[in-house]
A protein has these predicted regions:
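Bacterial N-terminal signal peptides
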Residues: 5-15
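Beta-propeller-forming repeat regions
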Residues: 16-383
Length: 383
């Protein structure tokens, strides 16, 4: 009854915001049928069109644009992924896929076939299988060598790397390597069931720092969650980073991404409470908290980018309990207006991608409770 009351109150607040929507975001259904936690997009087939890879029911599927032909590229009982990434792992010029399972921890990379991505199964290889509680993965060049690495958390308080987080360095020959090279940047100092990661140079020293959030709540036996934090990189990125806890107690904290919100040249932080309520941003360097939205329940995914093409950073989410897809318009100074994209879509994962090649950022959503994969077409540059 309490959740129902919250949802009804929220509906009244968000209906007012809905009147300010700039155009109608056309909904494109790619696939329906099962619970989806992850969807990524890239031109996997090399034809200039953006394709999609998602995972549901232990099957990893490639959907080929523009008609979204379904190709099973992986079918394995162990491949129930909660998050994923895509980049060229093996350096052969095409995009590969990375899937992460929560528990027991497992990260698998799928090698795209060189000749025909849509021909059938892709070769799957293990990148990591010793960290436990992998809720988020993120590509980033951590050591500054010009090659992408992979960030991942080890959220569970057990195993070899309890309450920790790592970055994985791709081996010189990932096709032959038994596992990727693991570096622990958060060593036993990320308790409370951490979720998703972010990366950026927060202190302006030229090194890549890492952000992380922990939800806390009833399932957190340590009682040490409900925080947002960043880890400062040292001269040697293979050594543990220095943790900086950000202000406030944040029940349900999940997502945290560096971005210059107010245009002052410093990276601020945008964050959401995906197992709680609301979105905020922290102003660098004081880390003063500013509200983005105080009403939205369960904004369990977050992306940042210039959605309306006005030169500043906006944000987007899709809430899995309140089933609201929304974007947040920045006025350039850190004051945000909520716009509802759709009022019956649930997600754990959202991506900002130009799906149709028209030069603006659309939203790709892996429908968790809504059991679908959809993308919403950005109308802001339509005639």
């Amino acid at each position: 009854m309490r959740i129902l009351g919250i949802l009804l109150a929220q509906a009244l607040v968000l209906s007012a915001a809905q009147a300010d929507v700039k155009g109608n975001w056309k909904r494109h259904v790619v696939w329906e049928g099962l619970h989806n936690n992850v969807a990524v997009a890239a031109d996997f087939t090399g034809d200039g069109k953006v394709d999609i890879i998602s995972n549901a029911g232990n099957k990893t599927r490639l959907f080929v644009a523009p008609d979204w032909k379904e190709v099973i590229i992986g079918d394995h009982m162990d491949h129930n992924f909660i998050h994923g990434e895509t980049f060229d792992v093996d350096g052969d010029g095409d995009a590969d896929f990375i899937g992460a399972r929560y528990q027991p921890g497992l990260i698998v990379w799928f090698e795209q076939p060189n000749k025909n991505a849509a021909a059938g199964p892709w070769k799957a290889r293990i990148a990591e299988d010793e960290i436990i509680g992998i809720h988020g993965v993120l590509k980033a060049d951590v050591n500054g060598d010009g090659k992408l690495d992979l960030l991942a958390n080890s959220a569970q308080p057990k195993g070899k790397f309890p309450d920790s987080a790592v970055w994985l360095e791709v081996p010189k020959n990932p096709r032959l390597a038994k596992r990727w090279t693991r570096h622990v940047f958060a060593k036993n100092d990320a308790p409370g069931l951490s979720h998703y990661l972010g990366a950026g140079d927060l202190n302006g020293d030229g090194r890549l720092d890492i952000t992380l959030a922990a939800k806390g709540g009833p399932s957190d036996k340590s009682g040490k969650g409900e925080w947002f934090a960043w880890w400062e990189a040292g001269k040697d990125p293979t050594r543990p980073f220095r943790k900086h806890l950000l202000p406030g107690k944040h029940p349900g904290a999940t997502n945290i991404l560096p971005a210059d919100v107010n245009g002052d040249g410093k990276l601020d932080i945008i964050a959401s409470r995906g197992h709680g309520t609301g979105l905020i941003w922290y102003e660098n360097p004081s880390w003063k908290i500013h509200d983005i939205n105080t009403e939205l329940l369960s904004s369990h995914c977050l992306q940042v980018g210039d959605i309306d093409g006005d030169g500043d950073i906006d944000a987007a989410t899709c809430a899995y309990i309140s089933r609201k897809a929304a974007w947040f318009e920045n006025d350039g100074k850190g004051r945000f207006t909520t716009h509802i994209i759709h009022d019956d879509q649930a997600a754990y994962d959202i991506r900002l991608v130009d799906m149709d090649g028209d030069g603006d950022l659309d939203t790709l959503i892996a429908g968790q409770r809504s059991k679908n994969v959809v993308w919403f077409e950005n109308p802001l540059r339509n005639p």
